[in-house]
């Protein structure tokens, strides 16, 4: 299956468990977006036989720091340069604290049809230990909003944090 992955290497803050390359400064966001658009054009000839793209994935970092217009620009450029399936899964990773008025609706309108929510835990103590920017209530709130808008979504939970108990994990899963 052919797919396109966009790595968005920006975060609001550093989470204590993360080993990925990222920056907490957005000053290079526009040059990196331009580089991604250029890369799509350069890689066009590398896909054999005009193979169909079944998935576009925005990972990070924190792709939800992009505006819907920026996401749309990357999706549209991918469609201009590749044979993107009409029913392609287009996923964007998102942190609960990045939800803002109309954001989820605008992402859906530009073609995002799946969200992956980086909740990590529903327990305040664990969120603080991980240095997450959101709180438990924001996690519940974004899940409530997503369920009314998206048929397809996933969420991340971290198992085995220091001082975590089986009861904490069970409550997270429930």
Identify what each model region corresponds to.
Residues 6-8, 119:
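Alpha/beta-hydrolase
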Residues 22-174:
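Conserved non-cysteine loop/helix-boundary elements of the Radical SAM core domain that shape
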Residues 9-20:
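Local cysteine-cluster metal-coordination motifs and their immediate loop/turn environment
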Residues 1-4:
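Extreme N-terminal starter segment of soluble prokaryotic enzymes
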């Amino acid at each position: 299956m052919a797919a396109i992955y966009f790595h968005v290497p920006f975060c609001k803050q550093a989470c204590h468990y993360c080993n990925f390359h990222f920056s907490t400064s957005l000053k290079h966001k526009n040059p990196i977006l331009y580089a991604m658009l250029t890369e799509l054009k350069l890689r066009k000839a590398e896909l054999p036989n005009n193979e169909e793209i079944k998935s576009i994935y925005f990972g990070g970092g924190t792709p939800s720091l992009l505006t819907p217009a920026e996401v749309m620009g990357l999706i549209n450029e991918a469609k201009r340069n590749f044979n993107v399936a009409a029913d392609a899964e287009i996923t964007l990773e998102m942190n609960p604290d990045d939800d803002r008025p109309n954001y989820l609706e605008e992402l859906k309108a530009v073609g995002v049809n799946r969200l992956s929510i980086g909740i990590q835990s529903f327990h305040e103590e664990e969120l603080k230990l991980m240095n997450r920017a959101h709180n438990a209530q924001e996690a519940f709130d974004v899940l409530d909003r997503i369920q009314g808008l998206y048929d397809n979504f996933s969420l991340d939970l971290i198992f085995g944090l220091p001082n975590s108990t089986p009861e904490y994990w069970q409550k997270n899963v429930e």
